[in-house]
Amino acid sequence: MAKESYKRDKPHVNIGTIGHVDHGKTTLTAAITSVLAKQGLALQRDFGSIDKAPEERERGITISTAHVEYQTKKRHYAHIDCPGHADYIKNMITGAAQMDGAILVVAGTDGPMPQTREHILLARQVNVPALVVFLNKVDIADPELLELVELELRELLTEYNFPGDDIPIIKGSALKALDGDPEGEKAIMELMDAVDEFIPEPVRDVDKPFLMPVEDVFSISGRGTVGTGRIERGRIKINEEVEIVGIKPTRKSVVTGIEMFQKLLDEGQAGDNAGLLLRGVDKTELERGMVIAKPGSIKPHTKFKAEVYILRKEEGGRHTPFFNGYRPQFYFRTTDVTGSVTLPEGVEMVMPGDNLSVEVELIVPIAMDEGLRFAIREGGRTVGAGSVTKIIE
């Protein structure tokens, strides 16, 4: 079947749902598509098709990151349903990194829970610019409790440097909206209005040199290897030369095809989730953690100085200090790389809650510029965050 070309007649915004497990993120995602489908602005996606992660399906826990597409009158949205379960923070970090804004889903019956806090913190760490809150399950929650939940949420958002007093909190029931209840549907439209208004149209990095972090790799028989990911900056056209940078020695290739949402494009640009077909590249030569970039625009490095913040125990961080030579994983863009930490002279140890400058040496090179952000992780758990301040080699 010939793929239809993708139209660009509205601003494109990447958003997603975040929040505690079982608070209704996936139900809300399904409800948004169902309500907008009635206005011809979306294809309806049922809960099961969004929640497709077979090994965990029985327990009703969403693991994989589902991509859904819909429109409002003003915008075109690519929506990610982020996993809520603590074990899947790894996916959350790649997912949240793809957001221009997020809908924080909180059950009115529970109020903020540990993962609510964790996701707000992660949103702050990966620089999600704006949040809108959907207070779910209000049909079965105690009205007096809802007022307290709202106050608590605003305080929590403020604590992590989001504008807690100004963030819209929309009350509703995703399940009722999904069942076609008029009150339920009205809340979804209110939510989409709030998302249109409050989540700023992203300032795209289209004028910078092209760069796309590789999230996944496929091979198409007879055509070659496809790298998928979200284009971080710049534009890419068919037949342009690119470099594949990081982990292994840098190599050149040519982009022979670009597709987005299963539709072919002649050009991809910053903000697009795209698949790039690469000439002469074997599936084994491309892996998650590499970047595809404009030749000469970015170099791989192993040693750098960074400003880091080490999470407090209460934020889900370490319970104990670490010392010179500490070897955690550094999560850059889409992958973890082990590295060793050298503390500044005169610093014996680092306590949870500390903020300091360190030197890091990675075991494999990663494409980096100054200002690149990363998470510091141990066995899949985020224990800190940082930003590259100076490249050494």
Curated annotation (Swiss-Prot):
GO terms for cellular component: cytosol. Residues 81-84 are annotated as: G3. Mg(2+) binds at T26. InterPro entries: EF-Tu_GTP-bd, EF-Tu_GTPase, EFTu-like_2, EFTU_2, G_TR_CS, P-loop_NTPase, Small_GTP-bd, T_Tr_GTP-bd_dom. Residues 60-64 are annotated as: G2. Residues 136-139 are annotated as: G4. GTP binds at residues 19-26, 81-85, 136-139. Signal peptide: none annotated. Keywords: Cytoplasm, Elongation factor, GTP-binding, Hydrolase, Magnesium, Metal-binding, Nucleotide-binding, Protein biosynthesis. Gene3D superfamilies: P-loop containing nucleotide triphosphate hydrolases (3.40.50.300), Translation factors (2.40.30.10). Residues 19-26 are annotated as: G1. GO terms for molecular function: GTP binding; GTPase activity; translation elongation factor activity. It comes from the Bacteria. It is found in: Cytoplasm. It catalyses: GTP + H2O = GDP + phosphate + H(+). Residues 173-175 are annotated as: G5. Residues 10-203 form the tr-type G domain. Its EC number is 3.6.5.3. It is an enzyme of class 3 (hydrolase). GTP hydrolase that promotes the GTP-dependent binding of aminoacyl-tRNA to the A-site of ribosomes during protein biosynthesis. Monomer. HAMAP family: EF_Tu_B (MF_00118_B). Belongs to the TRAFAC class translation factor GTPase superfamily. Classic translation factor GTPase family. EF-Tu/EF-1A subfamily. This is Elongation factor Tu. It comes from Chlorobium limicola (strain DSM 245 / NBRC 103803 / 6330). The gene is tuf.
